[in-house]
Amino acid sequence: MPVQVLNRLPAIKILQNEDVFVMQKSRNTFKEQSSLKVLILNLMPKKIETENQLLRLLSNSPLQIDIQLLRIDGHIPKNTPVEHLNNFYCSFPDIRYKNFDGLIVTGAPLGLINFENITFWPQIEQLFLWAKEHINSILFICWAVQAALKVLYNLPKFTRKRKLVGIYQHNTINSHALLTKGFDEKFLAPHSRYSDFPKDIIYRNTDLEILAESDEAGAYLLMSQDKRLIFITGHPEYDAMTLSQEYYRDLKLGLSPKLPDHYFPQDNPNLVPKISWRSHAYLLFANWLNYYVQQNVIKHLSSF
């Protein structure tokens, strides 16, 4: 089934070239009752690239999904035209009194910045608290996990001395959870973060269950007891070349970046990396949509 996005969104042509079924809509299109409403707060620097990545994963489902992109007002992005945000994104006042079936909050390059020094931190706090009352299921990715743990569980920020970056092997701990249904016992997924998520702190101070983890990267997939909050500390949405692009970007900035672990063939950055986590990413997002976003909608409707 298709994803529905606003007319002329750049991702449309890219996804259609990949035989992904995309439906276009105007801002005034009335949503069909059979569609799931999914809101995406896109905090990544290359927003158009992230749109492509997430829409590709969300389209791999029998469900029809109505996508709404959300921006932070007052924040001027450096890597995305303002016109793109004005044309395809809404602001918080536009959706304040609406409800959505799902919310995705992306990562952001803010791992070394204290929360109080982030100019739009008050908007993040407001959105997360609002989401608990207006969203059936929320998916936090990478930095958004750290931000959500602060806002929703009052956990302090934990930062690694060196950036964790690469493709790491993970172990499925709870194979009976619907979110991990069909997961291999061992699977690969990318990480690119300074954030750290100590297991002992999480277990002592939250109701979260760790569903999958990595010996090298630590906790990867977590879920709240009520199953409405889902946390992914890595970047399963990344394309094959995303870590490479980040590596060369940091080289140009003179940051002496660490070579991503287990990523470039023969650890040679001149060789083209292969994607080894695609099936995991598709399955993870499909499970989220099928068993948490849609099922919560069905439960809500059946309560009337």
From Swiss-Prot:
Enzyme kind, highest EC tier: transferase
Keyword line: Acyltransferase, Amino-acid biosynthesis, Cytoplasm, Methionine biosynthesis, Transferase
Record InterPro entries: Class_I_gatase-like (IPR029062), HST_MetA (IPR005697), MetA_family (IPR033752)
GO terms for MF: homoserine O-acetyltransferase activity; homoserine O-succinyltransferase activity
Domain of life per record: Bacteria
Intracellular or extracellular location(s): Cytoplasm
Catalytically driven reaction(s): L-homoserine + succinyl-CoA = O-succinyl-L-homoserine + CoA
Residue(s) at site: Important for substrate specificity: 192
A Pfam match: HTS
PANTHER family, per the entry: HOMOSERINE O-SUCCINYLTRANSFERASE (PTHR20919:SF0)
Name of the protein in its database record: Homoserine O-succinyltransferase
